[in-house]
Amino acid sequence: SVKKDVFHNWENPFYTAVGDIEQFNDELSKIDSDLFEAILPLPYFHIGSEIANTYNIVESSFSIPTTISYKTGIPMIGVCMSRTSFNQTISNLSLVKVPHSAIPFVNSFSNDKFILIIKSNYSLSEGELELLSHANLMTKKEDYELYSIQIKALKEYMNEPKKLAQYLLETQDSLYVVQDGRGQYISDIDDVIELNFDEMPNRKGMFDTGALILDKPGDNLILEVPFSSPQDSLILIEFWVKAKSYDLAKTRLLWQRITKDKKMYPPNFSLLEMVKSVADDWWLISLPVENVEELKSLKVWTVQSTNAPLHIDNVLIRSSKSTVIRKKGNILQKDNYFWSDSK
């Protein structure tokens, strides 16, 4: 069974997780710390401060990588009960959740170095299995296996948009893609091959996602997100925005939560802090929304303090379970999430 409390049973999760170093002497003698950028534990674990938690963990999947990291000094990508950046969390989870998706932080790694993968004897996700198939086996023990994958090979693995599209089409009935300001549903990989994914601001991320093109969004955008028995404690709303950096800096997001008992929270303002550039004048704005189990609906809108209109090309709402898109009254529904542009 899944041990959800494996970390919470220790007074100090790190030091009490470090096991007998001597049992790893043979393996440690084969590991040159200078060759490795990081350790990636599989199954991947993440228990951070933003509630985007994974719990498919057994004790060995934490204690073995922690022990080897402690002895070698190689940093570990997994997160256990620490303050975490939401953007970094998205990147980390993307590495193991969706095969062939672009992971920004890996681009800073040296092509000549390697990632040390430590696999415990526990079931892996499809994304983890796909990643592992590109790695080389170093050592196989009773409780764990060591693999290595060169950063150059990892970058090539991440830069295969056609394979990413194929994977997404295998898990969805259709894929909604955006190019040159127009969106279309596709259901055949041959149609995907004709599209230039490198020029598309709408990249599929770690979640099962969709995108909406707003034909005439106007100066401001308002969304109303109703919920019905949500499966997750966190969702992510993303805005792909085309704007000059000055106009973007003067724009704020305002959101208001309404709970199932009809309690209406005061609106909250937020400067667009979670922003990254994706192309010339294209920006990705992320708004994480936590504790959605309590929500009946969520309203989000932009407020500008400049006269220049902010062109919002499309909007994504992501969750780790489902996404539903509404475009001009046409509803594509998966599970219990959906969203609509409110008048």
Name each region found by the language model.
Residues P75, L168, D173-Y176, G181-G183, ...:
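Extra-cytoplasmic beta-strand recognition segments
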Residues S1-I74:
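Extracytoplasmic
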Residues Y246-I258, L298:
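Beta-strand acidic-aromatic groove motif in beta-rich domains, primarily in extracellular
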Residues G19-E22, I57-S120:
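Luminal/periplasmic acceptor-recognition loop/helix of membrane-associated glycosyltransferases
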Residues K262-L295, N307:
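Extracellular carbohydrate recognition and processing domains
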Residues V300-A308:
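Short beta-strand-plus-loop segments that form exposed binding edges in beta-rich domains
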Residues F109-K204:
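Aromatic/acidic, Gly/Pro-rich catalytic loop(s) in extracytoplasmic/lumenal soluble domains
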